[in-house]
Regions:
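Active-site-proximal region of nucleotide-activated glycan assembly enzymes
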Residues: 109-158
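Residue-level signature of catalytic and energy-coupling elements of molecular machines
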Residues: 25, 93, 137
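An aromatic- and histidine-rich active-site surface loop
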Residues: 88-107
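Short, well-ordered alpha-helical microsegments
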Residues: 21-24, 47, 97-100, 122-123
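N-terminal subdomain of nucleotide-sugar transferases
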Residues: 1-42, 51
């Protein structure tokens, strides 16, 4: 991703789980500073601290094998995309990303999935599920390019 604030990307929607997934998106601060942005993540102490002063909607968790929260997050995605109308959706996973990528893809919003830095030998489930709805897949390790044909190597975020 171009580090300059003058690159052609407009309003950003960041979607991720809390913890390391969120930390990797926050590490992109030089790229997103100065742009209008909105965050979707889980309400945890680390997320509240990292995103103090940011515009955030809290997602429902757990997301693994929890149909109720998948449906709630799908409603959240529809409401957020309608209200905020981002120019691009960026995510490092995990499960909360899927409804945002599917609905974003359906309405023509570009989606960027950044594979997490700690999965080098096998693809994550979220990356596999989001891949059909992903405009650009970015990886942090050269080894990850073997897992995802056509992925772009961007290097480590952390």
């Amino acid at each position: 991703m171009d580090g300059s604030a003058s690159s052609p990307v407009g309003d950003l929607l960041f979607v991720s789980s809390s913890g390391g997934h969120l930390a990797q998106l926050v590490a992109l601060r030089p790229w997103w500073t100065g742009r209008r942005r909105h965050w979707i993540t889980f309400r945890t102490p680390d997320a509240e601290s990292l995103l103090a002063g940011e515009t955030v909607d809290w997602a429902y968790h757990p997301t693994t094998r929890h149909l109720g929260n998948l449906l709630r997050n799908t409603v959240l995605a529809a409401r957020t995309l309608h209200r905020y109308r981002p120019d691009v959706i960026v995510s490092t996973g995990a499960g909360v990303a899927l409804p945002f990528f599917v609905l974003g893809w359906l309405v023509g919003i570009p989606t960027v999935y950044i594979e997490v830095y700690d999965r080098i030998e096998t693809p994550t489930l979220t990356a596999r599920l989001c891949r059909p709805f992903t405009s650009a897949l970015l990886v942090q390790w050269e080894e990850q390019q073997r897992l995802y044909r056509g992925a772009t190597l961007v290097g480590r975020l952390l």
